[in-house]
């Protein structure tokens, strides 16, 4: 929760990106936390960037479809699903 508070304090996307990048070095995230982070972004293009960046550090990957469902367009959902498939093909 401290992390979310820190993210909320950041005025600029670039500052939020820096905080997130630092956290990704040492921390794992849940799908629920990813969904909450997605709320910081207005556009699906930004949300997709976040999802691709955070997915390797998601602790409950089987639940990630809940995050995917938050995207507006099926083409964006398909893109993230393809990314996840490719991720698992490369890392298994």
Residue ranges and their predicted role:
Residues 1-92:
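General marker for long, soluble alpha-helical cores
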């Amino acid at each position: 929760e401290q992390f979310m508070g820190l993210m909320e304090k950041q005025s600029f996307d670039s500052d939020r990106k820096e905080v997130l990048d630092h956290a990704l070095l040492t921390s794992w995230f849940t799908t629920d936390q990813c969904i909450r982070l997605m709320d910081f972004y207005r556009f699906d293009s930004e949300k997709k960037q976040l999802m691709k960046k955070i997915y390797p550090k998601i602790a409950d990957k089987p639940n990630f479809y809940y995050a995917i469902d938050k995207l507006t367009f099926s083409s964006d959902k398909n893109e993230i699903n393809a990314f996840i498939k490719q991720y698992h093909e490369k890392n298994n």
